Amino acid sequence: MKIGFSFLSLKTLSVKRAISITKKLGGNTLELFGDLVLFYRGKFCEKPESIKEFAVKNDIFLTMHLPYIDINLASFNDEIWEKSIESILKAIEYGEKAGIKRAVLHPGGVPLSHLVLIFLAQRRLRKALEFILEKAEKYDVEVCIENPYFEENDIFSNVDQFHKFIKGFGGKLKVCFDFGHAHISKKGIDYSLNLLKPFITHVHIHDNHGEKDEHLSLGKGSIDFKKYLDFLRNFDGTIILEINSLKDKREDLKRSVEIIKGEV
């Protein structure tokens, strides 16, 4: 089982330290924070080659959450759209040097929920993904798109629309299934998981109370994870605990791993 943590969950600015913490907490996978590649022109970044070497030495599998802060791959503003693509490609290039094999991105948003705007935004996203998938394929990096909440400013109105969009890529585009997001969405986890399952190669897992994205440790919200343990324990992809609540401690992170592994 490839299971571990989001870089942000471990509350450190050092990737090597995050790798060490991941091992101590019972994980074997770490998801890098792609925005760090862009902050102050990468000022906080460690050399990707040294990250790769340290990860291999510690037997840690690396994935990356591609940039999402101020990024919109569906933007109608050409300059923002182009810079968003450029930012994603820069992060993929860095990630490939660091040894990542899988990367996650967000779909983007619209200023108003209107059928015409949603249609046009999806076209912009499709075009952006064509550039991104072409680059990722050269680097042997798999790209997964994350299911949103399907709220007012999302470019997909529901999970069925999201599913139809993904099918249009003929298997080249995979899905990062976010349990917390699905729990908030109107159709819920069961329907969303069953619909998207053929495309899911990556999972983000965290808890909430069904109203907002709280990123809590497992068991601290209202998701009944017992229903999904068989799926998770037999899953061939990567599982990332995206527990970013400031209230959760490392003991909570460790227990979340143990719950999924069946150790508690």
Which residues make up each language-model segment?
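Active-site acidic/histidine proton-transfer and metal-coordination neighborhood
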Residues: 16-17, 56-57, 74-174
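Hydrophobic faces of well-ordered beta-strands that scaffold small-molecule active sites
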Residues: 3-7, 30-32, 62-66, 103-105, ...
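Short, solvent-exposed loop/turn segments at secondary-structure boundaries
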Residues: 41-45, 74-79, 115-120, 154-157, ...
